[in-house]
UniProtKB/Swiss-Prot annotation:
This is Probable antibacterial peptide. GO terms for biological process: defense response to bacterium; innate immune response. It comes from the Eukaryota. Keywords: Antibiotic, Antimicrobial, Immunity, Innate immunity, Secreted, Signal. Transmembrane segments: none annotated. Its main location: secreted. The keyword Secreted applies. It comes from Riptortus clavatus (Bean bug).
Amino acid sequence: MHIARFCLLSSMAVLALSAGYVSGAVIEIPDEILDSARFISLYSDGLRQKRQLNLSGPGSEHAGTIRLDGQRNIFDNGRTRVDGTGSYQLDYARGMKPIHGAGLGAEVNHNIWRGRGGQSLDLYGGATRQFNFGNRPNEWGAHGGIRYNF
């Protein structure tokens, strides 16, 4: 069990260093978190990824969050682009069960106008679905608008 904890802490440190973000220090990780390490290690390669690791110390009851975000281009014909997104989040605190969450989403961008100097005017819209496994309700989100790039 000590080897598994060491491996998990080492992988968390690598995630944190690659993200450039660490807060506080890890003192103890509940055993339930070790079960989640398998999912994190299976997270697919080839995505544009953002990793965030937030670990806090004794002042906040050994609480923290591990979040992985990925984005992949699904379709692109030069004027219309569709990107898919996915995320996994693990919230934990000493004395409580970890809360897992996953999200899926898509965004569509359509170019309306393109200038000679590289400017562009785009319409965009997207939706996300957050699945929370625990006591929190699932959530929907939507966004859209006009984007001018200069």
